[in-house]
UniProtKB/Swiss-Prot annotation:
Protein name: Uncharacterized protein C34C12.7
Main location: membrane
Segment forming the signal sequence: 1-20
GO cellular component: membrane
Membrane topology annotation: Single-pass membrane protein
Cellular localisation: Membrane
Pfam families given in the database record: PAN_1
Record keyword Disulfide bond present: yes
Residue ranges of every copy of the Apple domain listed in the record: 38-121
Keywords per UniProt: Disulfide bond, Glycoprotein, Membrane, Signal, Transmembrane, Transmembrane helix
Length: 284
């Protein structure tokens, strides 16, 4: 009888140990290194007065994901601030470059900590003289995202990818279909690539189903390919099934960060100055 009780207790101990190991494995997810590459970290600094979204998240990676995916909704995030004491995430359309006077140090680090992350994927590393294009993925099979292109004359194309809602820990091909011009968002009618098109890159999703590829130069000439209105498809590598797609368009003003805003502001000031000069001249 005693032997049977000991056997049962040993079995229960074994089961609880296995459950503890499984639970521990679930909690310790590997970091998405590509996600982290898109951010420049500075401890105990923040941007004052320019939050456009605040939410409750436990881990900093969740906050960084929110920042990157905001571009899918055409709300450009230039920085993210995570307050671990309060499980709070604040994303902003400004950073220490666009608003240096509002970038201040937390003067009460003993009370709470602020982790500041500048989004360095908002613009390509080589942004001088580039034209910007984008393909907004429609998410008709669950995934949604944006693929951004930047190219200057005589140089290869730079590409950046953010896609969420895909199958976790899986490989996907980003394919360019040169012979298709989709109208009215009908690219979802294709189900397989059947060997057509060109694979621009392969991306890997993390445990949340998110794929990130920071800006990288690829062997592709967008000008030569005349990419406007051509189709980009996201293909699950193992099955060669198309899971997402979008047509390439000129990037919207909100897709370009401080460069667009600065040039627009300069143009507005110049136009205003001309109007003032003209009015003064008329009244002389």
């Amino acid at each position: 009888m005693l032997h049977n009780i000991q056997s049962i207790l040993q079995f229960l101990l074994f089961v609880s140990s296995v459950q503890a190991l499984e639970t521990g494995g679930l909690k310790s997810k590997p970091p998405n290194l590509k996600l982290l590459e898109c951010f420049e970290f500075k401890k105990n600094y923040w941007i004052v007065g320019h939050a456009f979204h605040t939410s409750s998240v436990q881990f900093k990676d969740e906050c960084l994901r929110m920042c990157l995916t905001s571009s899918i909704r055409k709300a450009k995030c230039l920085s993210a601030m995570h307050v671990p004491n309060d499980d709070e995430c604040v994303i902003s359309d400004q950073n220490q470059v666009t608003k240096p006077d509002l970038f201040i140090e937390n003067d009460t680090p003993g009370t709470f900590t602020v982790n500041f992350f500048r989004n360095i994927c908002v613009d390509p590393p080589d942004a001088e003289g580039v034209d910007r294009f984008e393909a907004r993925l429609q998410g008709y099979k669950g995934g949604e995202g944006i693929i951004e292109f930047a190219q200057a004359v005589g140089k290869n194309t730079q590409v950046m990818v953010v896609i969420s809602g895909l199958k976790e820990n899986s490989l996907y091909e980003i394919n360019f279909l040169p012979d298709t011009k989709e109208k009215g968002g009908q690219c979802h009618r294709k189900s397989r690539v059947n060997g057509e098109g060109k694979t621009l890159m392969i991306v890997e999703t993390d445990h949340t189903g998110m794929a990130v590829e920071p800006w990288k130069v690829i062997d592709f000439d967008g000008f030569e390919e005349n990419v406007i209105s051509k189709t980009i498809v996201v293909v699950e590598k193992s099955t060669q099934t198309i899971v997402d797609c979008g047509s390439i368009r000129l990037a919207t003003a909100s897709s370009n960060s401080s460069t667009t805003r600065t040039s627009s502001s300069t143009g507005l000031k110049f136009t205003t100055g001309l109007l003032i000069i003209l009015v003064v001249f008329l009244f002389l």
